[in-house]
Amino acid sequence: MGLLHEYAADVVWTGAGATGTTGYAAYSRDHEVRVAGKPTVLASADPAFRGDPARHNPEELLVAALAECHMLWFLHFAATSGVAVVGYTDRAGGTMRVEAAGHGQFTQVVLRPQVTVRPGGSAATDGAALDAQLADLHRRAHEHCFIARSVTFPVLTEPAPAVLETAGAGSAG
């Protein structure tokens, strides 16, 4: 049996106002996500569902969680493979279908990582060879991502061509 990890978060509704849920349009969807010892995340519903567009919504946070998990595993495999990643940006996106009855589900999330690599170490120096090497690291990251392994919809990875760091350059982003 594997090692179990447990996670806890408090979600606190802050949008009751004076009327609470006396009507569908009467209450705010604003809430806070609190985890002990960490900054509070101000959250709401997606604006399509009467949420505050200035706050994070659960759908965005799910897409972000998938992108973060993939990135962290990718960085792990890059480090253990001798590939010096110096920049990583993912412009991830998800698609959710909502049925006429109001229920819905994600149909897919697409991760679009852009990786900047420092030449040397075990990194390939040819563009195509480096892209193939990084594709293998992305494959391994996807296979290990706890969150991607926990969802029922496809999580696709469409990496951009790798960027080789040039002298004096910073990271991707």
Question: Where do the model's predicted regions map?
Answer:
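Extended beta-strand/beta-hairpin segments
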Residues: 1-64, 72-173
